[in-house]
Amino acid sequence: RIFDADEGHLLRAACAIECVHTYSLIHDDLPCMDDDDLRRGRPTLHRAFDEATALLAGDALQTFAFEALADPATHPDPQMRCLLITGLAKASGAVGMVAGQVADMAGQEIGSDLIAVTRMNRLKTGALINFSVDAGAFIGCASEAEKTALSRYAHDVGLAFQMVDDILDAEGAVRDTGKAVGKDKDRGKANFVTVLGVEATRERVGMLAAQAKRHLALFGPRARVLLDAVDFVVQRRH
């Protein structure tokens, strides 16, 4: 929207990203991963149905995401569609989200290494957030300076989002979060709170939020929706 890009193109790209995001949550909740019973205040898919259904639903969402991006309705330029497909594949695959999930599953081995925890979360959570912003920049034909500013914004928002998630896991309530809390501590998994503590993590969230907003100065009032997104990330309780 900053670049007055076609709303239909943006929404189709956003839907593809959300399909990948939702597939990742379905698989993350499986017994072989985090083994969670609750998601968004409702039973997880494998609890509501069964593991096979959950696995296949996740697979279907993942493949549908790329089917949607490949459709000319997403963008008339085939090179743009290829750019979006490649970007989402990298963000969600072996050098992005999946790599982060592998590190998360080995959480006990990470221990108190802040650099390792940061890298894990930049991949597991941040990669998809980064691509969400990159996709808008691609479709909007942003300049190199604008792409750089947006990439830095997404980096900071992604880390802040995960830090808030870790704070909610440490001191949130199930009625607010819609999912189990205290999981990482119970399982001995490393996160920002287990490494830094709640207050130090909260301070870093504030620093990252302020920094993310500064990256948007280039866009002036056009960046209102992205500024609001920073506030949402910081203030969310779910």
Residue ranges of model-derived segments:
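Mg2+-dependent prenyl diphosphate-binding active-site environment of isoprenoid biosynthetic enzymes
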Residues: 1-164, 170-213, 221-234
